[in-house]
Amino acid sequence: MIDLWPAIDLINSTSVRLTEGKYDTKEKMEKSVEDSIRFYSQFKCVKRIHIVDLIGAKAKEVKEFDYIRSLRKVTTKPIEVGGGIRSKQTIENYIHSGIDYCIVGTKGIQDIEWLTHMTHQFPNKLYLSVDAFGEKIKINGWKEDAKLNLFDYVAKIEHLPLGGVIYTDISKDGKLSGPNFDLTGRLALYTSLPVIASGGIRHQEDLFRLESLNVHAAIVGKAAHLDEFWEGLS
């Protein structure tokens, strides 16, 4: 089974889900953040918890640091955090607080020199989040066009000691309509970096198909809140 990384998206320390990254589609989840983490942590196939500070992503600076730090005591699973991470100090703060991995997006996409320095200071601790409509990369909470092609950009960071590349097809996100198998599979073939699929994953069949495409792990958002998604998993 492909590694599962259940996603928890935070707004004001509350678990929510968005559709296509649009903040006006915010839907509050029934379970609390803590209860969700405890539920996910009982499964061996869950290899880490993926947490995103949505307001931080929008504001271009971390907003939920203290709350996210408090979640470290809820689980023994590794935790990765993204949203508004744009400085060495922020990365250090998270790592020193017990967070295992940090996700960088906009800053790393806009400033490859900075990304290079950070990956060498924190080797294999950073994941690059590349969010795109198809091959067109978006930045700043998915609101702006980076004017970069997915494959052209990944070629430039291929040599860096990143933990991997998280690819989200925004058009699929939060819709439970299936991931973009074509582009995700092409990306997994294109780069030697581990590729993590995100956006649109519905059920276990999607996971098996992603695994067949040599995708390293799957970030599961909305589907992870459905009991039937977990049936038969251990």
From Swiss-Prot:
TM annotation in the entry: none
GO BP terms in the entry: L-histidine biosynthetic process; L-tryptophan biosynthetic process
Catalytic machinery residues: 9 (proton acceptor), 131 (proton donor)
Name recorded for this polypeptide: 1-(5-phosphoribosyl)-5-[(5-phosphoribosylamino)methylideneamino] imidazole-4-carboxamide isomerase
Keyword Isomerase carried by entry: yes
EC number: 5.3.1.16
CC per GO annotation: cytoplasm
Pathway noted in the entry: Amino-acid biosynthesis; L-histidine biosynthesis; L-histidine from 5-phospho-alpha-D-ribose 1-diphosphate: step 4/9
Cellular compartment(s): Cytoplasm
Main localization category: cytoplasm
Coiled-coil region: none
Domain of life where this protein originates: Bacteria
Claim: Isomerase is one of the keywords in the record: yes
Catalytic activity: 1-(5-phospho-beta-D-ribosyl)-5-[(5-phospho-beta-D-ribosylamino)methylideneamino]imidazole-4-carboxamide = 5-[(5-phospho-1-deoxy-D-ribulos-1-ylimino)methylamino]-1-(5-phospho-beta-D-ribosyl)imidazole-4-carboxamide
Organism per entry: Staphylococcus epidermidis (strain ATCC 12228 / FDA PCI 1200)
Keyword terms: Amino-acid biosynthesis, Cytoplasm, Histidine biosynthesis, Isomerase
NCBIfam families documented for this protein: 1-(5-phosphoribosyl)-5-[(5-phosphoribosylamino)methylideneamino]imidazole-4-carboxamide isomerase (TIGR00007), PRK13587.1 (NF010114)
Family: Belongs to the HisA/HisF family.
Entry's Gene Ontology molecular function annotations: 1-(5-phosphoribosyl)-5-[(5-phosphoribosylamino)methylideneamino]imidazole-4-carboxamide isomerase activity
